[in-house]
């Protein structure tokens, strides 16, 4: 089974110096389970100069949940409650050589597909005339359930779900009902 968690549009205008801080996604979301994926679809050519996503290879296997922080021009934790079960993310940028960081350039329509615990970030858009846009769609699988823990994004919480409940609802629609694998 597959549920739609939510979708989102990311835009980095030309000459945007601000980087997207290193983070993993799942701590931001009111969902728990291992089967949580992001698909980030390029709408424009994406290069390191325009702010391509960078990933730490294998970091989803760390099973570490890092404290969510505000994005954009703001700093700190002002939009997220502190959760004692989370840890602060290490200073990856200062220690880049300590990590196996990978990235790929994308043409419009190409996709990054990654686990919600994969640590990733992106540089600013240093291009003078090129906008960098990406459309992200997040899906959950069989083991994903609603999670009422502190520190998640307010817009992704639901008044219609209780802790541990399956996500099937108008808020998190079922998009693939079969639990067996394709081809089985």
Residue ranges and their predicted role:
Residues 1-56, 60-62:
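Conserved double-stranded beta-helix
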Residues 24, 83-98, 129-131, 150-158:
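Short, surface-exposed loop/helix-turn segments at secondary-structure junctions
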Residues 24-27, 40-41, 98-100, 119-122:
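Glycine-rich, charged/polar anion/phosphate-binding loops
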Residues 33, 41, 92-93, 98, ...:
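Catalytic cores of transferase enzymes with a strong primary signal for eukaryotic protein kinases
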Residues 38-42, 101-103, 111-113, 134-136:
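Conserved hydrophobic/aromatic beta-strand scaffold that supports enzyme active sites
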Residues 48-119:
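Double-stranded beta-helix
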Residues 65, 69-71, 108-113, 117-184:
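Non-heme Fe(II)/2-oxoglutarate
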């Amino acid at each position: 089974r597959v549920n739609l968690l939510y979708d989102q549009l990311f835009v980095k205008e030309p000459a945007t110096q601000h980087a997207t801080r290193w983070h993993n996604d799942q701590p931001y979301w009111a969902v728990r389970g291992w089967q949580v994926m992001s698909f980030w679809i390029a709408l424009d050519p994406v290069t390191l100069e325009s702010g391509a996503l960078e990933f730490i290879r294998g970091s989803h296997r760390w099973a570490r949940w890092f404290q969510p922080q505000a994005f954009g021009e703001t700093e700190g934790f002002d939009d997220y409650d502190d959760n004692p079960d989370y840890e602060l993310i290490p200073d990856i940028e200062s220690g880049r050589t300590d990590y196996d960081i990978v990235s790929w350039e994308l043409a419009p329509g190409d996709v990054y597909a990654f686990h919600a615990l994969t640590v990733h970030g992106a540089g600013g858009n240093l291009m003078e005339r090129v906008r960098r846009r990406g459309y992200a769609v997040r899906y959950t699988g069989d083991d994903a359930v609603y999670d009422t823990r502190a520190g998640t994004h307010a817009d992704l919480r639901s008044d219609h779900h209780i802790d541990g409940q399956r996500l099937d609802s108008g808020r998190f629609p079922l998009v693939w009902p079969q639990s067996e694998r394709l081809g089985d």
